[in-house]
């Protein structure tokens, strides 16, 4: 009998003040090469909410769970975190794919959602130069993780990270490889099957393909609408947490 995998690291923040959304629960799902703590600024803008965020399998505090075995395991992990409790869901980047797939299969637990620029590499026009279409696949996992991080945060930020942090991030390369591979096998969700209200967010400073994908995804979702933060890029939850929080409140109101 195989040993059970260790549990995912889950962060829970109870409301810190009274407000109109008292009792509202949100679950936050991070993207590739990220972790739950990247939502700290966003959580601070939702003081009257209960917030659950978790390190996805293979990252940060969940590194001991190992790389995901497939995309279905990502959805299963989200359902395990929810534990049969209904929540408004926010998914950033790859986390948006997880949220949409989860909403398609378990709309009773995710009644409404906000997703920010989820990759859609199964679309025929999706650029070959993106990681989700295989760019960097020839690198060793550790090197691909560093390559990915440098593309996301820039060389200067990467080189200023503490040595221990860079070692940890490089070690997450096997997880990155596994989840990017899962996106290369075909669509991980059927937009037509996502019947819940969804706000598809995009940044005014994001890449052309991310902006196009946001528009097309919002149109393909039965109850999808698009929202844009003009001065934001892909990392809007870090650069514009107040605006993302406002969109999450708007998503909750659509439930």
Regions found by a protein language model. Give the residues of each.
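Glycine-rich His-Gly loop
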Residues: 28-31, 93, 203
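Gly/Ala-rich beta-loop-alpha elbow adjacent to hydrolase catalytic centers
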Residues: 91, 95, 99
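Flexible "cap/lid" loop of the alpha/beta hydrolase fold
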Residues: 100-139
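Active-site loop/turn elements of alpha/beta-hydrolase fold enzymes
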Residues: 54-58, 118, 231
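Conserved serine/cysteine hydrolase catalytic core
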Residues: 165-220, 225-228
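Active-site loop/oxyanion-hole signature of alpha/beta-hydrolase fold enzymes
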Residues: 41-44, 50-90, 246
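Catalytic histidine-centered segment of alpha/beta-hydrolase-like enzymes
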Residues: 229-242
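Conserved HGGG/HGGXW glycine-rich cap/lid loop of the alpha/beta-hydrolase fold
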Residues: 6-64
């Amino acid at each position: 009998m195989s040993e059970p995998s260790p549990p995912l690291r889950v962060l829970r923040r109870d409301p810190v003040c009274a407000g109109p959304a008292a009792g509202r629960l949100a679950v936050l799902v991070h993207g590739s090469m990220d972790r739950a703590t990247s939502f700290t600024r966003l959580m601070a803008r939702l003081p009257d909410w209960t917030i659950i965020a978790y390190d996805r399998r293979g990252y940060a505090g969940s590194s001991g769970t190992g790389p995901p075995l497939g995309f279905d395991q990502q959805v299963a992990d989200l359902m395990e975190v929810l534990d049969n409790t209904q929540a408004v869901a926010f998914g950033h980047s790859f986390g948006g794919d997880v949220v949409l797939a989860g909403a398609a299969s378990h709309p009773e637990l995710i009644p409404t959602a906000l997703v920010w620029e989820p990759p859609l590499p199964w679309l025929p026009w999706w650029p070959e130069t993106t990681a989700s279409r295989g760019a960097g696949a020839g690198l060793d996992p550790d090197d691909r993780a560093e390559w990915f991080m440098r593309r996301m945060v820039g060389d200067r930020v990467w080189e200023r990270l503490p040595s221990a942090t860079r070692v940890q991030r490089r070690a997450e390369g096997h997880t990155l490889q596994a989840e990017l591979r899962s996106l290369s096998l075909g669509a991980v969700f059927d937009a037509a099957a996502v019947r819940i209200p969804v706000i598809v967010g995009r940044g005014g400073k994001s890449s052309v393909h991310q902006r196009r994908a946001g528009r097309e995804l919002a149109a393909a979702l039965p109850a999808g609408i698009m929202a844009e933060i003009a001065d934001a890029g892909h990392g809007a939850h870090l650069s514009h947490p107040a605006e993302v929080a406002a969109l999450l409140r708007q998503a909750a109101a659509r439930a």
